[in-house]
Amino acid sequence: MFERFTDRARKVMSLAQQEAQRFNHEYIGTEHVLLGLVKEGSGVGANVLKRLSIDLRKVRIEVEKLVKAGP
């Protein structure tokens, strides 16, 4: 499915999958992709977030407030 993605995009999706597992979720949602973008740290998305002074810790705190962990 990800063969048409760039290496960086595949890395973000891999990190998003790790985040989904951390939340004990059986899906990859936008919240996981957002965390993956920030965690990857070097893509356009990560750089935009850095310029807005948004880091992984801040994003994780806000995601955890909004998203419940799975069973």
Protein language model features and the residues they cover:
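Histone-fold recognition with a strong bias for associated Lys/Arg-rich disordered tails
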Residues: 1-71
